[in-house]
Each structure stands twice: as structure tokens, then as C-alpha cells.
Curated annotation (Swiss-Prot):
Membrane topology: Multi-pass membrane protein
Classification via NCBIfam families: ATPase_P-type, kdpB
Source lineage: Bacteria, Pseudomonadati, Aquificota, Aquificia, Aquificales
Gene3D superfamilies: Calcium-transporting ATPase, cytoplasmic domain N, Calcium-transporting ATPase, cytoplasmic transduction domain A, HAD superfamily/HAD-like
Keyword terms: ATP-binding, Cell inner membrane, Cell membrane, Ion transport, Magnesium, Membrane, Metal-binding, Nucleotide-binding, Phosphoprotein, Potassium, Potassium transport, Translocase, Transmembrane, Transmembrane helix, Transport
Amino acids binding ATP: 348, 352, 378-385, 396
Pfam family, one: Hydrolase
Protein name as annotated: Potassium-transporting ATPase ATP-binding subunit
Role of this protein: Part of the high-affinity ATP-driven potassium transport (or Kdp) system, which catalyzes the hydrolysis of ATP coupled with the electrogenic transport of potassium into the cytoplasm. This subunit is responsible for energy coupling to the transport system and for the release of the potassium ions to the cytoplasm.
Organism, scientific name: Hydrogenobaculum sp. (strain Y04AAS1)
Complex and partners: The system is composed of three essential subunits: KdpA, KdpB and KdpC.
Binding-site list for Mg(2+): 519, 523
Gene: kdpB
Stated family: Belongs to the cation transport ATPase (P-type) (TC 3.A.3) family. Type IA subfamily.
Subcellular compartments: Cell inner membrane
SUPFAM superfamilies found in the cross-reference section: Calcium ATPase, transduction domain A, Calcium ATPase, transmembrane domain M, HAD-like, Metal cation-transporting ATPase, ATP-binding domain N
């Protein structure tokens, strides 16, 4: 179960965004967006010009009125784009607030005395102890120091299946607003009121603490610089117009309204209008995937990451060893081994035991109905499990444990057993030896199954220039086998925390951007060093503090998804910027010939659309410049889909679509608007 999708066309969101877009007309609000502030100033100038034309009975008052209207709409559409992104965030924040409202805590004086004082959750401070029991709503983020809980985290993650939280493990962290399904535990508050994970999520999705990323700042500097350049051009254009008219005694001075229209159409208003929405929508897109980015820098770094450190278990493999093959010893048939392995796994509740039972039943058509038997559960000291019937003893376990067991009954060890065990281990499997009474029958090859499609995914990442490194505690032989089968570029075997840290530093020194996942306290140093650090929400507080991205689903494979979303955000920003700047070329060929047609009729050669009425031509460009903003809002919010490919191919593809398309589309759009306006004016 995932979070409820919020439609772009949700009635409540559209209503709130419309109201906020009007409120944002306040010049103080627009100081954050200098380009749109300059458009608002231009709108004010043309509005005053309209009233002046009315007062002086100027025949072109209709032109001033329409240009003013569409310039104001340009600012409103820009505000609407940002407001709709913010409103989606506020809607999500509202549901999060409901998860933490009216919470109480059972405060303890010490963990040995379970007598508690019931206080408001807001009174708990970092370091305070509190009791958690069945049906309690967890009042504050904390770490279990005693006990085990089954917790429903759907209020935060959207996942209805409860999860286990246990003290002394890497899954000891509990989150405010989640509910205890069963169990009892003592926890220590790991944060102060207002600093909980839900509080951070609320701030982030509302955009209250969203800082501009380095790429956003660089892009803002670019579009502000372009705006200043075009402003200087327009001012000089006015001076040139004066000089031309008075020196040649022909034509007329370009009006203030035309100059403002020229400035607004040439300035990069499209990207300036949509840039805030792209940033906010990026956070929202991650949130829909149950991923919380604690900073905008983390998202950008994810988009630039070119080395992924991936945990083998959970990311590349399922983590549950499953029966893959039966290998009998000399003198034993495969069917005989299957029968003994099947019997030894009856009643076994472990994942491996269930796998062997299902495998032998399906492949060898075994179905045995035992009534009088005793299950011998796995014991860490003996490393053996099995079944005892009235007359027979079936066992399975590690090779040395089974050899010892068989020898105790006076049995012998098959000559080729060691070779079979060694070959299975070399291939990355786990050899489980099977015996009946004093005889060894063979080996069950247990394999940590590689997730389907993972090799294709790694191949796509490689094509996009991203290197994958598998992290595992397995021995080098096993690690090499799994790495080859999965298709990763490199692996780190028998990895200790200090090994991870050393390898991350090594790649960073070579100029790579490194991304990794982790959930334990021992992962914290490496997470802190990585450029993109994804911590599991179930992990320890130390791991979450060191990370800059939190995965609420506790799925290590999400790292690949995080990188993909990061690239989508960067590509979206680049695509709309390219489209916006390319638009200026088309609008130049419409407005400039129209503006100087009387003074310089020779420049009509630039009027490639052959628009006869210069006033309607300029108005058409202004209208198109305004309506393209709401047309691109869905793209800004949903993003340009990322397809794994090398940087050169991606650049050529996006330049073709958004560069060439950005030049051609306005010609077509302005031409359509022109003829609609022409027909409308003829009817009037």
C-alpha cells in the first residue's frame, strides 16, 4: 500500500493554488523571483499606459489593454505553478500532522521501574525514558533499549503490514505517530519535541525548509543575467528608435507597451516561472515513493551519482537461501537423496527448511503423511535440524556437524563429500549435508537467489555511465561468483565498516560521486562520507543522522530508484531551460519585425510567418508567452522520464526534443493565436 496519489487537477488543490497565486502578486513575495518581479513591473507600466491612452482617446488603447491583461496573466500563471506544487505538499503535510496530533507518553524514571507518569508527548525531552505497550501511539522518535515490538508504521510509510522493532539490533528505531500492535518495550527519546522525523517530513513537503540547490542557484544567476541583458537591449532599442525617427523623419518611435512586450517575451520567463515548482515537485516525487530527501543537495547529488555501493542482501539477492539443486554422494541416487532431504525438512519453519520441503515435493513428486514424528529444531550449538520417526533419524546441517553426527553412529564419510561441499561454496552457494541415521546421502545446494531483472538494470546503469559495487560479508570466492552472475562492475568481499569508508574515499579521490545505503550504527561513518547516503527508516538513529535521504520502506534496492529520480529532476530542469531559451529565438522573429516595421520596412524579411498586422503579431507573442507556462506545469510536476543512456546520447536527444522543438513549437503556436485574434477582431 502506497500513499494516496494527489492529482494535479484535484479540486481543493486547484482552489487553494488559485487563491495563493493572487496573494503572491505582492511585490515582496516576488522578490524571490526577480524575473517575474520585472514582469510585474512591466505589467504595471503597461496598465498605466492603458489608462493614459483611454484618457487621451488613443486608438491603440485596445492594444495596451490586451497586452496588460496577458502580462498580468503571465505573472499569475507563474504564481499558480509554484502554488500548485506547494498546495500538494501542504495536503501531504496535513495527513502527517493528523498522525502526531494529541499524543501522550508514558514517562519512566528508570527502565527497571515500570511505574509511569502520563504526560503530553510535547513534554518529552531527548534522553527521557518512556514505556510502550500494545495499542500505544509512539509519542516521539526513539531507540528501544529493552523489549520487542510489532509496530504498524502505515501512518508514516503507507505500508499496512506491521514490522518488528527489537532492542540491541539494527532495527531498534521507532518513529513518532506509529502504532504498537503487540509487545512491550522501554525506549529512550532520541530527539526533542519539534525535531521528530514526522516534523522534518512536514517541513520538507511544505517547502518551509527547502533551500535552493547549487544547480538552482547557478540557473537563477543565468536567467537573471539574461534578463538584465535583455533589459539593457530594450532600453537601447528605445534610444535607437528615437534617433532613427528624428534623423530620417519616417516611422514612429516604438511605444512603451511594445518595448515591455518585447522585454517580457525575450526574457526567460518560462523557466523563471517553473523553476520553483520543479524544485518543490522533486521533493514531492520522492515522497510519493516513500523516500524523504533531507536536503536539496542530496537530490542533486543523486542525479550526479556515478558509483553505487549496493548491499548484496536485499538489493541484489532476496536474502533468503533457497533450495537450488540436490547433489548425491557416490552410491546414492538423486531420488533417494530427495526423499531423505524431504523427510529431514518436515515441520521445519525456517526459510531454508520450507524451501527444501517445497523443492523436493514439487520436483520429485513427494508427498509423505507422517503422523508419529518429532521435529528436531535447529540449534546454533549443534548446527543441525531434522526429524525423528519411530525407527529412523533424519538430519541436515553443516558438513562438519553432520560428519560428526554420522561418526557418532559409527558411520563413514563419503570420499567425494568434501569436493561437493567445496564446489558449492565456490559457486556462491551454501552446502547443506543430509543424512539418515549413520549414512550421508548428499548435499542440498542452497542458493541466495538473485532478483530477476537485476542484471538488466545493472546493464542499463552501465550504459548511463554508472558503476556498481556490491558490498557483502561473503568470502571473496562466493562474492566473485555472485558478482559475475548479477553483472556488477566490482565487489567488496568480507566488508567491514572501515573497508566501506576506505573504498568510498578512494572513489571520491578519483572524482566519482558515490551513493550508498545503510541501516546500522557501524554504517554511519561511511554514510556520512558518501555524497548520497540512503538510510533505512528502521535503522539506528546514528545511521539516520549520518544520512541525507531516508527510505520509509526499508528497501536497500531503492538506491537505484533514488538515483533515477535525481536524474529526472536534473533533466527536467535542463529540458525546460532549453525549451525556454529556444522559445526566445522564435519570438524574436515575430516581435522585432513587428516593432520596427514602420521605421525599417526592410526588416520585414525577418517576418517569416508573414503576419500582416504588427499589433496582433506582438499580442500573439505575448499571449503565447503566457499560456505556455500552464501548458508546461504538468511536465514540471511529473518530470521528464529518465531513460538510461550515455551523456552524449541524452544531450543530443534532449536538444532535439526541447531545443529544436522549442524553436519550432512557438512559430506554430503564435501563428494559431494570431489567426484566432485576427478572426476575433474582424467579428468585432
Amino acid at each position: 500500500m502506497k500513499k494516496k496519489e494527489l492529482s494535479i487537477f484535484d479540486k481543493d488543490i486547484l482552489k487553494e493554488a488559485s487563491i495563493n497565486s493572487i496573494k503572491k502578486l505582492n511585490p515582496v513575495e516576488l522578490l524571490r523571483n526577480p524575473v517575474m518581479l520585472s514582469v510585474e513591473i512591466g505589467s504595471t507600466i503597461t496598465t498605466f499606459d492603458f489608462f493614459y491612452d483611454l484618457a487621451t482617446n488613443n486608438n491603440h488603447a485596445w492594444f495596451s489593454a490586451n497586452v496588460s491583461l496577458w502580462l498580468w496573466l503571465t505573472v499569475l500563471f507563474s504564481n499558480f505553478a509554484e502554488s500548485i506544487a506547494e498546495s500538494r505538499g501542504k495536503a501531504r503535510a496535513k495527513s502527517l500532522r493528523e498522525a502526531k496530533s494529541n499524543l501522550f507518553a508514558k514517562k519512566l524514571k528508570n527502565k527497571n521501574d515500570k511505574t509511569y507518569e502520563k504526560i503530553p508527548a510535547s513534554s518529552l525531552q531527548k534522553g527521557d525514558l518512556f514505556l510502550l505497550e500494545k495499542d500505544d501511539i509512539i509519542p516521539i522518535d526513539g531507540e528501544l533499549i529493552e523489549g520487542v515490538l510489532l509496530v504498524n508504521e502505515s501512518a508514516v510509510t503507507g505500508e499496512s503490514a506491521p514490522v518488528i522493532r527489537e532492542s540491541g539490533t539494527d532495527k531498534s528505531s521507532v518513529t513518532a505517530g506509529t502504532k504498537v500492535v503487540s509487545g512491550s518495550a522501554v525506549a529512550v527519546a532520541s530527539v526533542n519535541p519539534g525535531e521528530t522525523f514526522i516534523d522534518k517530513m512536514i517541513s520538507l513537503v511544505e517547502g518551509a525548509k527547502r533551500r535552493k540547490t547549487p544547480n538552482e542557484i547557478a540557473l537563477e544567476i543565468l536567467i537573471i543575467s539574461l534578463t538584465i541583458v535583455f533589459l539593457v537591449v530594450v532600453i537601447n532599442f528605445r534610444a535607437l528608435s528615437y534617433y532613427s525617427v528624428y534623423s530620417t523623419n519616417k516611422g514612429s518611435v516604438v511605444s512603451l507597451v511594445v518595448l515591455v512586450a518585447l522585454f517580457v517575451c525575450l526574457a526567460p520567463t518560462t523557466i523563471a516561472a517553473l523553476l520553483p515548482a520543479i524544485g518543490i515537485a522533486g521533493m514531492d516525487r520522492l515522497f510519493k515513493k516513500n523516500i524523504i530527501a533531507l536536503s536539496g543537495r542530496a537530490i542533486e547529488a543523486a542525479g550526479d551519482a556515478n558509483v553505487l555501493f549496493l548491499d548484496k542482501t536485499g538489493t541484489i539477492t532476496y536474502g533468503d537461501r533457497q533450495a537450488y539443486k540436490l547433489i548425491p554422494v557416490e552410491g546414492v541416487s538423486e531420488e533417494e537423496l530427495a526423499m531423505v532431504a524431504h523427510m529431514a525438512s518436515i515441520g521445519d519453519t525456517t526459510a531454508e527448511g520450507k524451501s527444501i520441503y517445497a523443492f523436493t515435493k514439487a520436483k520429485y513428486n513427494l508427498s509423505i503423511d507422517l503422523k508419529d514424528y518429532k521435529v528436531i529444531e535447529f540449534d546454533a550449538s549443534t548446527r543441525i535440524s531434522g526429524v525423528d520417526t519411530k525407527n529412523e533419524h533424519y538430519r541436515k546441517g553443516s558438513s562438519d556437524a553432520i560428519e560428526k553426527y554420522v561418526s557418532s553412529f559409527g558411520g563413514s564419510i563419503p570420499k567425494n563429500l568434501d569436493k561437493i561441499v567445496e564446489e558449492v561454496a565456490k559457486e556462491g552457494g551454501t552446502p547443506l549435508v543430509v543424512a539418515k541415521d549413520n549414512r550421508i546421502y548428499g548435499v542440498v545446494y542452497l542458493k541466495d537467489i538473485i532478483k530477476p531483472g537485476i542484471k538488466k538494470k545493472f546493464r542499463e546503469l552501465r550504459r548511463a555511465g554508472i558503476k556498481t559495487v556490491m558490498i557483502t560479508g561473503d568470502n571473496p570466492l562466493t562474492a566473485a561468483t555472485i558478482a559475475a552472475e548479477a553483472g556488477v562492475d566490482d565487489f567488496l568481499a568480507q566488508a567491514k565498516p572501515e573497508d566501506k569508508l576506505r573504498h568510498i574515499k578512494k572513489y571520491q579521490e578519483e572524482g566519482y560521486m558515490v551513493a550508498m545505503t545503510g541501516d546500522g550504527t557501524n554504517d554511519a561513518p561511511a554514510l556520512a562520507q558518501a555524497d548520497v547516503a540512503v538510510a533505512m527508516n528502521s535503522g539506528t538513529q546514528a545511521a539516520k543522522d549520518a544520512a541525507n535521504i531516508i527510505d520509509l520502506d526499508n528497501d536497500p534496492s531503492k538506491l537505484i530508484e533514488v538515483v533515477g529520480i535525481g536524474k529526472e529532476i536534473l533533466i527536467t530542469r535542463g529540458a525546460i531551460t532549453t525549451f525556454s531559451i529556444a522559445n526566445d529565438i522564435s519570438k524574436y522573429f515575430v516581435i522585432v519585425p513587428a516593432a520596427v516595421s514602420k521605421s525599417y520596412p526592410e526588416l520585414n524579411i525577418l517576418n517569416i510567418l508573414h503576419l500582416a498586422n504588427p499589433y496582433i503579431a506582438i499580442l500573439s507573442a505575448v499571449i503565447f508567452n503566457a499560456i505556455v507556462i500552464p501548458m508546461l506545469i504538468p511536465l514540471a510536476l511529473k518530470g521528464v522520464k529518465y531513460r538510461p543512456m550515455d551523456a552524449q546520447t541524452l544531450l543530443v536527444r534532449n536538444l532535439s526534443i526541447y531545443g529544436i522543438g522549442g524553436i519550432l513549437f512557438p512559430f506554430f503556436g503564435i501563428w494559431i493565436v494570431y489567426w484566432i485574434c485576427e478572426i476575433f477582431w474582424r467579428v468585432l
